[in-house]
Regions:
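Exported/periplasmic cell-wall-interacting domains
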Residues: 19, 38-141
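Electropositive
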Residues: 5-33, 38
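Local beta-strand/beta-hairpin segments that build beta-sheet-rich folds
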Residues: 1-2
Length: 141
């Protein structure tokens, strides 16, 4: 392991079923990177920049700063891309380290920008159910 980032994964725990709001585990590749050059705090909806979050408190689970859209490499997680499972920044950084998402992997905005910079499309990442973190293989950094 070369890098580890604290994250927030699904409040519903790990899983692979569409509509379950669970975070899939296993091996993935970064299928698509979205948000290159966007300001920290840029709000994305349907993978399009639609505004900027200014730090105000809100209950909505915003997708911020960068998106790394994942594609599953294992039989069990092969539907990940179609489930729109991302690694992304969040407006709820205080919940990092706790299960809180609707299936995506949330990171602090600084960390997701750093990860976005480090990983090319096609890079492999591992999500484990035993730790609230994302592991990156040595050759990708």
């Amino acid at each position: 392991m070369v890098a580890w980032y604290p994250v927030s994964t699904a409040a519903n725990g790990p899983g692979f079923v569409p509509g379950s709001n669970c975070t899939p585990t296993g091996r993935f590749r970064v299928w698509k990177k979205i948000g290159r050059g966007a300001r920290m705090g840029t709000i994305f909806r349907s993978r399009e920049a639609v505004g900027h979050w200014r730090g105000e408190t809100c209950e909505e689970d915003l997708i911020l700063s960068r998106i790394l859209w994942l594609d599953g490499l294992d039989a069990a997680n092969g539907n990940t891309r179609e489930r729109y499972i991302y690694i992304h920044g969040t407006n709820q950084e205080e919940r990092i380290g706790h299960t809180a998402s609707h299936g995506c992997v949330r990171m602090t905005n600084r960390d997701v920008i750093d990860l976005f910079r480090r990983l090319p499309e096609g890079a492999e990442v591992v999500i484990e159910a035993t730790a609230l973190g994302v592991i990156l293989p040595p050759l990708m950094l």
